[in-house]
Design a protein with these regions (language model features):
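An amphipathic, aromatic/His-enriched active-site/gating alpha helix that lines ligand/cofactor pockets
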Residues: 24-37, 56-90
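Short, low-order "capping/linker" segments at domain edges
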Residues: 95-97
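Short alpha-helical linear motifs
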Residues: 42-46, 77, 89-93
Length: 97
């Protein structure tokens, strides 16, 4: 299993809305692809302007097989649903043994 780890920065007062829109747009879009195993949302009370997403993939090849144009289309859809500033400020990849 491979973990895609993303740290998102968003205004604290918009954090809950961001999580809700992500669950509506991104999670179903990723779930359509082979290898998607699930997704977790982690929140740290010390950093109310940050959201951590833990996305579980069966293999890196399956994760990387998602076409860039598909990801761009989902990004556009998300930005229409959530038209506020947000940014991926850190990303990591982990292999689970």
């Amino acid at each position: 299993m491979v973990i895609e780890w993303l740290k998102i920065q968003v205004a604290p007062e918009l954090r809950e809305e961001f999580i809700q829109k992500d669950a509506i747009v991104w999670t179903p879009a990723l779930a359509k692809w082979d290898g998607f195993l699930g997704k977790e949302v982690w929140l740290d009370r010390q950093f109310p302007d940050q959201i951590i997403f833990i996305i579980h993939w069966q293999t890196k090849a399956q994760w990387q097989a998602i076409p860039e144009d598909y990801l761009a289309a989902i990004t556009r859809e998300f930005n229409q649903q959530f038209p506020y500033p947000s940014e991926i400020i850190e990303s990591q990849e982990y292999q689970v043994y």
